[in-house]
Amino acid sequence: PEPTGDIKRVAILHAGGLAPGMNTAARVAVRLGIARGWTMLGVEGSWSGLADDRVRELSWSDVEGWAFKGGAELGTKRDIPPVEQFYALGRAIERNEIDALLVIGGMNAYLGVHAITSEKDRYPAFQIPILLIPASIDNNLPGCELAIGTDTAINNATWAIDRIKESAAASKRCFIAETMGRRCGYLTLMSALSSGAEYMYINEESPSLEQIAADADRMVASFKSGRRLFLTLLNESASQYYDREFLADVFNAESEGIYDVRHQALGHMQQGGSPSPYD
């Protein structure tokens, strides 16, 4: 069909940390745009890719198989475009005749879009529709109830923790698992609920030394009562001082030889894999 309205060429780029479902969102946007008669463009390498003119047209078949593919086929970076890059971005938008920009990403994408739209009076090329689709395992974007990728990250974390529990339950053991999420405790909270964790430490309620000591006392008492496994989840930014190694040292020092302590960061596996059906 012939394009309607002023929009004819739409560019898609990823920005911020990787989130499962980024490819799915891009695929839907490309095919919906083509169905409306628009020319859909893919920007490789996020904002710096746009500044360097790494822009190519995406056809219907180019996004074949992206529906359940993990990663980000167009590439993504956490960089927020600096002021020095605005001129290059504006020129790239003009050269490629981009009528609208669709950004898929998390908090850094949000900050990047805000930085660009704040300068639209100085750079006429930025006076185009710019839309952000929230995609972040952290689920920390303003005005967004649930970002793309969050559900998959919770499933990934729960899957890993379940296997940790099977291993730890074989002997009396306290296990501390560190989740991602930056300064937002949503991923840690939901993973704790779904995995049945006894303790949870998040940035919103940063733990104190007194709380950790009291928790250690309660844990020792529970092991003396016959408990075989004690699971603790820790957000990666829960505390500036009390990280998982510190918690492990405290819990181990108070163990009285009744149990042993292990700790593990779940790491980037929370960002990987195919998106869940919900995402």
PLM regions: where:
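Short, ordered loop/turn segments at secondary-structure junctions
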Residues: 15-17, 43-49, 78-79, 106-107, ...
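Short acidic, glycine/serine/threonine-rich loops at helix termini
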Residues: 22-26, 51-57, 85-87, 112-117, ...
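Accessory alpha-helical/coil subdomains and C-terminal extensions
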Residues: 40, 92, 100-105, 111-127, ...
